[in-house]
Amino acid sequence: MTESDSADARLLTPADVRRLAAQLGIRPTKTLGQNFVIDPGTVRRIVRAAQVSPDDVVVEVGPGLGSLTLALLPHVRHVTAVEIDPRLAEALPGTVADHAPAYAHRLRVVTADALRITELPDPQPTALVANLPYNVAVPVVLHLLNLLPSLEHGLVMVQAEVAERLAARPGDRAYGAPSAKIAWYADVRRAGAIGRTVFWPVPNVDSGLVALRRRPAPPTKASREDVFAVVDAAFAQRRKTLRAALSSWAGSAAAAEAALRSAGVDPRSRGETLGIADFARIAEHRP
């Protein structure tokens, strides 16, 4: 994507962001994890990395003042923006009408907490592209992947440490419950690093891009809830062997060992060495 690609969508400059925030009486809050992107080059980069197509319907969580929304609209069929702050949600259509009038019809705004939504209006989203609030990034991604089976792919900007965890593989230092759970839904990879200076206010941490590609869940007789219960138990005491960590889940250490052996997993191993298919097998053998 080049400058000309967004010729009909005038992207927000740092001055635009501060002006809009002042007009709305917005002071970014840590409670909502608000850090607004002020660099047009960064939002172009996100759209490029997201590999969206003209057929994609994008769900964007936390559009804020509209920096990424404006960059997305010329390149996709539709954007459903989910915004928890009523002031920002109310202002976004006007910002799009001013900066990208040719694409204003492609936008729908839903005023809601993304963690609490139970449905979205049609057309159903095929892609998740968002600068996610740091404090809810992992729960939001997992909730939307579970809620919206239509989601085929996505790209999210999150805290660098969260990006590392989401993309970690079994055996990696950062591998944990989020890594295992997201693997139930998608293949995940790091897609780049983002510096602090592209945000206002400047955060205390760096950010990273994470790309997602939907894939089938592991073949298993166990439900997602049952598998995730094993994951949670395994990582609640990650320094312990699985025999010990899963003792409460199974009812006793002996029962945990029996379930692990039935699943073909060494009871002396730790959760950080297992993939999501391993956790699914263990769930199938719960006493």
Swiss-Prot record:
EC number(s) given by UniProt: 2.1.1.182
HAMAP family: 16SrRNA_methyltr_A
Name of the protein described by the UniProt record: Ribosomal RNA small subunit methyltransferase A
Annotated residues for binding of S-adenosyl-L-methionine: 35, 37, 62, 83, 113, 131
GO terms, molecular function: 16S rRNA (adenine(1518)-N(6)/adenine(1519)-N(6))-dimethyltransferase activity; RNA binding
Name of encoding gene: rsmA
One GO cellular component term noted in the UniProt record for this chain: cytosol
Gene source species: Thermobifida fusca (strain YX)
InterPro entries: KsgA/Erm, rRNA_Ade_diMease-like_C, rRNA_Ade_Mease_Trfase_CS, rRNA_Ade_methylase_Trfase_N, rRNA_adenine_dimethylase, SAM-dependent_MTases_sf
